[in-house]
Amino acid sequence: GGGAGIFVTNIIVFGVWFWELDRGGPFARKAGENPYPDFMFPQMSGVPAQVARPDWRPTFVDYLYVSITNVMAFSPTDTMPLSARAKLLMTVQATVAVSTLVLVVARAVNVLP
């Protein structure tokens, strides 16, 4: 129970942090204040118009997905971190996930008769 709570909290908290980090947050992104992204989503890499709209912008769900895949794979999957702060934040998230997993497994082994 406790490990699952930490796991879900890790995903949500880091999803919010990724959303707030990228280009200064959602309001700064909308205003176009910072043209340099912290994350490179596949839709931003010149994919054909049949795959992504030309005006596509990441939403909170996209950052939550990045958080989920980072925890599950312990690495970036389709969305690459570009800035040092994005890389550090993803590293911290994966470290928290691995540490939680190790502690839960150690506790489970410890309670065996």
Language-model segments: what does each one mean?
Residues 1-27:
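Pore-domain transmembrane helices of cation channels
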Residues 57-113:
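Pore domain of cation channels
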Residues 22-78:
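Membrane-proximal soluble regions of multi-pass membrane proteins
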